[in-house]
Amino acid sequence: MEKPDPKVIVAIDAGTVEQARAQINPLTPELCHLKIGSILFTRYGPAFVEELMQKGYRIFLDLKFYDIPQTVAGACRAVAELGVWMMNIHISGGRTMMETVVNALQSITLKEKPLLIGVTILTSLDGSDLKTLGIQEKVPDIVCRMATLAKSAGLDGVVCSAQEAALLRKQFDRNFLLVTPGIRLETDEKGDQKRVMTPRAAIQAGSDYLVIGRPITQSTDPLKALEAIDKDIKTR
């Protein structure tokens, strides 16, 4: 039986495994995937990821690898062998790094290889932040150029804000995935994200998967919030 493929990826941003379980317990794999980041993975390692997969969840392991090509390739092989659904690397690591990772993943035998997604510009950054780094180019132009590089290197898609998703969807077909963080409900605060959009607007813009954290995990009724978002994006 084919696993469900909901469009929502719930970001589990917790400091302890107990806090993470409390965020996850009200949810269901029928309506969401889960994103596990560097804090939880550094503290609890593969065992916690395996625990969640045994409950039926597909896992986006969000470690944003960025290093020399062989180091990143080795790390991605290890993640792939863990059995996660999706992983990511920084596109700014360059073409050689990305192609080395793609080749490494193609060389191993797995029932289901993970989706390899490239990170463009973090949604916590905007044009003024980039200028402090000496980058004068506009964010949308950088994102489009990086996404083109990622696709040519063999990646399955990119992480981008919903604003850039609208531009990228005109450039790439649906075989190239757009994963969008910075999703907020209309009544939510932006938090630490600067380039944000609502769920329905993001899907309409061309995003394939929406990474949503606090609007669900900090809701008084997380499952109800998830169901409302799922219904909203399906009625677009």
UniProtKB/Swiss-Prot annotation:
Catalytic activity: orotidine 5'-phosphate + H(+) = UMP + CO2
Pathway: Pyrimidine metabolism; UMP biosynthesis via de novo pathway; UMP from orotate: step 2/2
Binding positions (substrate): 13, 35, 62-71, 123, 184, 193, 213-214
EC numbers, comma separated: 4.1.1.23
Record keywords: Decarboxylase, Lyase, Pyrimidine biosynthesis
Family that this chain belongs to: Belongs to the OMP decarboxylase family. Type 1 subfamily.
Functional summary from the UniProt entry: Catalyzes the decarboxylation of orotidine 5'-monophosphate (OMP) to uridine 5'-monophosphate (UMP).
Full protein name: Orotidine 5'-phosphate decarboxylase
Species annotation: Coxiella burnetii (strain RSA 493 / Nine Mile phase I)
